Amino acid sequence: MSSNIEPQTTAKCILYTTKGNIAIELWAKECPETCKRFLSMLSDGTFTNGEFKELKPTQWLMFNANSTGEYRTVAEEKNPRIRFNRDGLLGWDRRRNTWFITVLADSKHVLNDCNVFGKIVGKSIYIFREILGGEIEASSRDNDVKRFMYPAVLKDVEITIPFFEDIFGSKRRLEDNEKKEQEPAKKLVKSAKVKMVYEDEQEDDDGDVQKLKPRKRMILPAWIKDDSRSEGIKLDASLDQPQEALIREKTELHDNVDEATTKETESQENIKEEPMDKRERETLAMLSKFQERIKNKNILK
């Protein structure tokens, strides 16, 4: 029978296993007692930490709960539109009071005494098939029933649509390690800035500034201190001397200039007042006689 004639599902839940998450939808309206039993045992933690341990390759993957509690046997619920006609369907084993998931496409001929009440939806079918591919133990209780060496474990459940009024929707209870992963990362505290502060700078009032330790100074002997002090006194005295020397030098230079100017003036006056000597007079006389001789004569012939 094709799945397009199946009735609409009315309840939903998510199984969180160690191999991945499996989304399940239930026909709570068509199989009310079976679906209510399944959701009740999920919500009260009966199935928590149970294992998908046993596999019958021709029929089902059985869920093995640690305890089924004191629940009475579920009544038989049949619907002509819902049948075991493919893999990934949920069935209830009324004799063992637990549930399973079908493996083969058509196993209705061996599951007539079980109630079909739900199905795996979406991409969860690939998680289910991955569970089926787990490693099988070498020895088994029965030749037909195999046991997984590392079975998938049901760690938590989430009922998203309970359908029944006395069953409330539940959110997933996170494990401790998952809570740590989902905790928001703490903001990194910025480290205080380090600023170099020198002795000749004013202190900074910024609270984030950390001052460096003052540098160590060398302690000089007493005799070096005395010499440095005396040299400092001499240096201070010598700082005033250049100004006095400059003033004195300017005054002396001015006096020397005035004295030189006076001497030059006096020498010029003495030159004007001195009479011509004998040789100069003789030279002038000879020049006068020469001029008289050549007067009116053409000496260029």
UniProtKB/Swiss-Prot annotation:
Its EC number is 5.2.1.8. The keyword Isomerase applies. Residues 251-280 are annotated as: Disordered. One of its GO terms (biological process) is mRNA splicing, via spliceosome. Pfam families: Pro_isomerase (PF00160). It comes from the Eukaryota. It catalyses: [protein]-peptidylproline (omega=180) = [protein]-peptidylproline (omega=0). It is an enzyme of class 5 (isomerase). Residues 9-159 form the PPIase cyclophilin-type domain. GO terms for molecular function: peptidyl-prolyl cis-trans isomerase activity. One of its GO terms (cellular component) is Prp19 complex. Keywords: Cytoplasm, Isomerase, mRNA processing, mRNA splicing, Nucleus, Rotamase, Spliceosome. InterPro entries: Cyclophilin-like_dom_sf, Cyclophilin-type_PPIase_dom, Cyclophilin_A-like. It is found in: Cytoplasm; Nucleus. PANTHER family: PEPTIDYL-PROLYL CIS-TRANS ISOMERASE-RELATED (PTHR45625), SPLICEOSOME-ASSOCIATED PROTEIN CWC27 HOMOLOG (PTHR45625:SF6). Belongs to the CWC complex (or CEF1-associated complex), a spliceosome subcomplex composed of the U2, U5 and U6 snRNAs and at least BUD13, BUD31, BRR2, CDC40, CEF1, CLF1, CUS1, CWC2, CWC15, CWC21, CWC22, CWC23, CWC24, CWC25, CWC27, ECM2, HSH155, IST3, ISY1, LEA1, MSL1, NTC20, PRP8, PRP9, PRP11, PRP19, PRP21, PRP22, PRP45, PRP46, SLU7, SMB1, SMD1, SMD2, SMD3, SMX2, SMX3, SNT309, SNU114, SPP2, SYF1, SYF2, RSE1 and YJU2. Belongs to the cyclophilin-type PPIase family. CWC27 subfamily. PPIases accelerate the folding of proteins. Catalyzes the cis-trans isomerization of proline imidic peptide bonds in oligopeptides. Involved in pre-mRNA splicing. Present with 2360 molecules/cell in log phase SD medium. This is Peptidyl-prolyl isomerase CWC27. It comes from Saccharomyces cerevisiae (strain ATCC 204508 / S288c).
